[in-house]
A protein has these predicted regions:
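Catalytic alpha-helical scaffold of carbohydrate-active enzymes acting on polysaccharides/glycoconjugates
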Residues: 1-112
């Protein structure tokens, strides 16, 4: 994609995580319970992807490894529709709570 000189170019990113994985619930919803909770991420991403397709918009989707492991078809669709895929770590752990080794392990786990 090329842009004319002096044109406005915007960046758009999406955090691909489920409702129970947002920071507001950290300390309220235990990570060990995630498997038993109602999953909405695929349905919500479908809606976002459709809106972006309708508007001919591309974005970067920052995806949790936890979500990627459970929804590989969703990640393939994101890429197939021309969006960029990026890592948001394994399970949304805040980097300032991790030491260097834990951070490296989290990124490596998410990469796989």
């Amino acid at each position: 994609m090329t842009h004319p000189a002096n044109s406005v170019v915007n960046g758009l990113s999406v955090d691909v995580e489920d409702w129970f994985q947002v920071g507001a619930f950290e300390g309220v919803i235990d990570r060990d319970s995630w498997e038993s909770l109602s999953d909405r991420v695929e349905r919500n991403c479908d809606a976002i992807l459709q809106m972006f397709a309708d508007a001919d918009v591309k974005a970067t989707f920052f995806t949790l490894g936890w979500v990627a492991q459970r929804h590989p078809a969703l990640l393939r669709r994101i890429v197939e529709e021309g969006h960029e895929l990026a890592s948001h770590g394994w399970d949304h752990a805040r980097v300032f709570t991790m030491d260097k080794a834990s951070f490296a392990a989290d990124i490596e786990r998410a990469r796989k």
